[in-house]
Amino acid sequence: MILDSLRAVLSSLPFWVAVAGTALLTPVAGRVGRRIGAVDSPGQGKIHTRPIPRSGGLALAGGLLVAVLGGMAAGSGAISWSREMIGVLTGAGIVTCVGLWDDMKGTTPLVKAIGQLAAAGCLVLVGIRPDFLPAPLAVIIVPVYVLGSSNAMNLIDGLDGLATGVAAIAALGFVAVGMAAGVPIVSGLALVLLGSCLGFLLHNFHPARIFLGDSGSNLIGFLLAVLMIGVVTDRHDPRWFVAPLVILGLPIVDTAWSIVRRRRQRQSILAGDLGHIYNRMVERGLGHRGAVLACYAIGVACVACGLLIVGSIGRGPS
């Protein structure tokens, strides 16, 4: 399964366009970020010692859009112009814009949640939802996926290259899952997301020259939610639900542990702290790069476990 996915990646024009497009747009996004004030200044609890632009979402969004449009123009089987794709692109635009505003001016969790709910509404309107569930439940589950995934990726974006690399590893897993499930929009979007993350990682790995920012982490989280929802549409076997959650095991577990930890300490679950899994790794002597690479290894293990679950179902819809 994974070998088929690797062959699909290496032979995919949209993947390579996403890699090149995002890599080339990232320095431009950095300059734009400095000009519009989307800059992360050094401070307590931060590892960088100089102001760094946090406008990476602009580069990711630009690279993704170029790759998707290029795939459509080239007649890529995995990426085509459809109402579902329009819904995905619209939702992606919403979370990117809301996130960028937060990176520039700062905003409240409520405003960010409203943006994420609006993006989830775009998916529901174009039919990206678990159709086999009763309509009210299917409509409720989509925002849960979007809010959960977006905030999980935001929380794990604490070290240079961490969120981007973990997302790339998960995206490769979703390429395989989409192919096994026979859902072209999942495998196609996963290919493009993988390429964009790798292109951005060239500038974001330690020492980072640019950060994802809320625009980038929310965009990645939204697209991962789309992939998870796309896998479970029209599938009754519960293993199709479980496999995507296992693939994203690291950010999900880190988020769950953060909520529990903060409640125990009588803190707001929205309060930042240094108790994340990756922070503990740094404290125990792994260092910045070592902690990131260790998290990558955990991400690979999660993807492997998710693919084992999918393999136990067999190819094609259940």
Residue ranges of predicted features:
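Mid-bilayer segments of alpha-helical transmembrane spans in multi-pass integral membrane proteins
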Residues: 96-100, 121-129, 151
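Single transmembrane alpha-helix segments in multi-pass membrane proteins
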Residues: 146-154
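PRPP/pyrophosphate-binding module of the type I phosphoribosyltransferase fold
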Residues: 150-151, 160-164
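Juxtamembrane helix-capping/reentrant segments at transmembrane boundaries
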Residues: 41-55, 278
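Hydrophobic alpha-helical hairpins/lids featuring a short glycine-rich hinge
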Residues: 86-116
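Alpha-helical transmembrane segments
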Residues: 2-37, 61-97, 136, 141, ...
